[in-house]
């Protein structure tokens, strides 16, 4: 689907009821079927006669017997690649492989392996109708979490990141039934199109209603009114359906630290949306009823590609987090999904953000230029521009990080007492940054994202773009701006007192 997409751009850089729905909002409290030791999500789906046809995770095996690679990273320093596998069959990712391989540099996730025998791997997405420029892979070090007591890495999607497979095997097409889930974060969201995982067009274009069937998670409201907060919706192409014909305020969403997002669609008459806290409890059914009555959704016309982090036409302005997800053949039962949720909870996903220190004054040095982030002419007025300059040891080049939420910070210039701001809340590539009075909005909130080797990317919350050294310039006075993530050192900053 396409909406609020980044404008197609080129840059030289060192690189989504006439029939009454049987819909309810209920909390499912049953525990589902009993699980044997070592029984993981795809084993559970298989026992329910709805086997996985795609299974993706950078954190753990999704079959009890799986002992292969989970994902592949590419090293920035020399372009070499390596696979990250599991510690043992049916186990968790061996993050030490990544840490060792990427030591002294940064890495990009370039492939997420399908754990089924169908080889529906995800690779970096090509351009499409909404944005003809190919996407970028995710920063491999950006999302460290704990699962099963082990350090592992999720997939951190910023604006411009996306993965795809247009030539899949066994994924539902036409009106065939399917189910799917993903585990994501309830605090890393925006209102741009489209943080999706699931079934999409095979040509990277919006080809019409019913051609997609993907889980969406975020705050974009396609059919007003919407409940506030991030919600699971069905991206069925040309609409993010919270339930029914689109607007479904009973789908109140979920903003827990980790979220289980569930969607199933029988292809002809019915779909269902569920969510759960991936750390505890059961699934809530947000909608279970008739497919939309608008033209094209009865029956569905799914095409069978798989996308992650983007819309079907490569709309790539969204942000989100991905830890694991599967797609099934057939329409899973509630009991099966309950058992899968219980297994996800057993993983014990957790996350701890300890850097930077709240209120400490830091200097931000661009890795490519060696220059520090600077308020032009030590300005203190609203609108003061931001550039890069040799370190002068003054407070015009010092910044305090003040925590305002889950890895969300305002960045205050020590001399001016004003915060780092995306000018006019811009969404376009190249949006300038300046100093402004604190307004409490997401245009002034930043995520501090590790990139390995003591380097960080700074992601503004409203657009998902990163703080960028304009054209990778090295001269004093070179401006800072916002751009999609490009996997280069011009967008990395060392942060030190």
Indicate where each model-derived feature is located:
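Extracellular glycan-associated modules
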Residues: 30, 39-52, 107, 127-137, ...
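Residues that flank catalytic or metal-binding motifs in active/ligand-binding sites
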Residues: 67, 108, 151, 176-178, ...
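Secretory targeting and sorting signals
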Residues: 2-36
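GGW-centered surface loops in extracellular recognition modules
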Residues: 37-132, 181, 346-352, 359-362
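Extracellular glycan-recognition/adhesion modules and their associated mucin-like linkers
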Residues: 354-380, 395-428, 442-474, 489-497
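Acidic glycine-/aspartate-rich tracts in secreted/extracellular proteins
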Residues: 78, 116-118, 187-189, 266-268, ...
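Short, hydrophobic/proline-enriched secondary-structure or compact coil segments at domain edges
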Residues: 65-79, 153-155, 181-182, 306-309, ...
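Compact disulfide-stabilized, cysteine-rich extracellular microdomains and processed peptide cores
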Residues: 309-312, 339, 390, 417, ...
């Amino acid at each position: 689907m396409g909406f609020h997409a980044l404008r197609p751009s080129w840059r030289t850089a060192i690189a989504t009821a006439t029939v009454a729905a049987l819909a309810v909002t209920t909390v499912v409290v049953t525990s589902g079927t009993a699980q044997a030791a070592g029984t993981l999500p795809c084993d559970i789906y298989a026992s329910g006669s709805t086997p996985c046809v795609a299974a993706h995770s950078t954190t753990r095996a999704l079959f009890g017997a799986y002992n292969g690679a989970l994902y592949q990273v590419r090293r920035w320093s020399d372009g070499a690649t390596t696979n990250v596998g599991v510690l043992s069959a049916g186990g968790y990712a061996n993050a030490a492989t990544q840490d060792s391989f990427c030591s002294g540099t940064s890495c990009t996730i370039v492939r997420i392996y399908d754990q089924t025998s169908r080889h529906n791997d995800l690779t970096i997405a090509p351009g499409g109708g909404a944005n003809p420029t190919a996407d970028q892979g995710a920063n491999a070090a950006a999302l460290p979490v704990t699962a099963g007591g082990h350090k592992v890495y999720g997939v951190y999607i910023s604006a411009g990141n996306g993965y795809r497979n247009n030539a899949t095997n066994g994924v539902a097409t036409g009106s065939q039934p399917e189910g799917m889930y993903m585990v994501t974060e309830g605090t890393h969201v925006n209102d741009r199109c489209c943080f999706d995982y699931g079934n999409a067009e095979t040509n990277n274009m919006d080809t019409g209603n019913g051609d997609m069937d993907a889980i969406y998670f975020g705050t974009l409201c396609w059919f007003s009114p919407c409940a506030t907060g991030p919600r699971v919706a069905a991206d069925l192409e040309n609409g993010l359906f919270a339930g029914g014909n689109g607007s479904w305020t009973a789908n109140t969403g979920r903003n827990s630290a980790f979220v289980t997002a569930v969607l199933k669609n029988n292809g002809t008459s019915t779909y269902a949306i569920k969510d759960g806290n991936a750390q505890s409890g059961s699934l809530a059914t947000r909608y279970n009823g008739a497919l939309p009555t608008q033209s094209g959704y009865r029956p569905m016309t799914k095409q069978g590609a798989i996308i992650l982090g983007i819309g079907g036409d490569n709309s790539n302005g969204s942000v989100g987090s991905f830890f694991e997800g599967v797609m099934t053949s057939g329409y899973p039962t509630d009991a099966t999904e309950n058992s899968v949720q219980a297994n996800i909870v057993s993983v014990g996903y957790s996350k701890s953000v300890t850097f930077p220190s709240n209120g400490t004054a830091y200097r931000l040095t661009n890795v490519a230029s060696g220059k520090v982030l600077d308020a032009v002419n030590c300005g203190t007025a609203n609108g003061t521009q931001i550039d890069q300059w040799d370190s002068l040891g003054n407070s015009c080049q010092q910044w305090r990080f003040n925590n305002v939420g889950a890895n969300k910070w305002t960045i205050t210039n020590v001399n001016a007492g004003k915060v780092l701001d995306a000018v006019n809340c811009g969404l376009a590539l190249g949006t300038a940054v300046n100093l402004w009075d604190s307004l409490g909005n997401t245009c002034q909130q930043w995520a501090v994202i590790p990139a390995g080797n003591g380097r960080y990317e700074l992601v503004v919350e409203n657009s998902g773009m990163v703080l960028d050294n304009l054209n990778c310039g090295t001269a004093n006075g070179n401006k800072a701006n916002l751009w999609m993530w490009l996997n280069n050192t011009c967008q990395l900053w060392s942060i030190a007192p």
